Amino acid sequence: KEHKESVLIIKTAWGGKSLHTDFRSPSAGPYQFNDKQLAQFQKQGKDVDKIKVDKVAATGHYYRLMMAHVKQVLADVKRVYPNYNESRGYELAGFVWFQGWNDMVDRGTYPQRDKPQGYAQYTECMSHFIRDVRRDLSAPDLPFVIGVMGVGGPIEDTKKRAVHVNFRAAMAAPADLAEFHGNVVAVPTSPYWDTKLDEIAGRINKVRNMQRMLRTKNKNHANKDGSMTRKQQRAYIDDYRKTVVDEQDAATFQRGASNAGYHYLGCAKTMAQIGYAFADALVKMRR
């Protein structure tokens, strides 16, 4: 709707990766283990020197892969878009960063994560990342969207509240820096979390938990004496499931979810709305 020209999206996405190590950009410098991490390694009898060497090798590896891929595509756009007009060239219209889980759950790198500024290192790394991407792509004012992690949706008063609040704040913080005013925007994704699917997922997990309780002969459940056969366990679970998840909810979940919570339940509706929000933010920055 906004452009008559073609739009090429260059995607690089490796799961289970961190910003503090895997996507750490050059100007962020080397990863520094904190004293608590080093003490823990020594207590566990691990080879600290080897850990440090391995960390150096891993640091920035996926940043380099990402940049190499982007540059490879831009060097031969016709390979992926045969109708590309070389005489007109291309314009780098924006960059979207959507990540976070592996940093948020890392107690080692962020030992004070439940405290204010507990994720300050993430903010620093993200700021360096933006600068380095712009430098390496020769696009000093490249519009940049930070997709603020929204797993779990609106934050409620739970024991994990501080962690989620602090991490989301750290992700969004670079957009408030004066140097990024007007060309870096933090876009919350929590509003697009599917609360209905999440509620059903919680009940489905109760069924899975019951399966585990029977299988492990948990002392507080029906198979505590281990007398139930596998057939009897399946029959028990079938009956239990009917009391926890009705057919309509099961069908809703089957239709709407395809992955775990940390992947937004694999909900296409959620992802579509997030993608639209990112695109809308980029368009508004360019106006």
Residue ranges with predicted function:
Residues 1-287:
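Cell-envelope and extracellular/periplasmic
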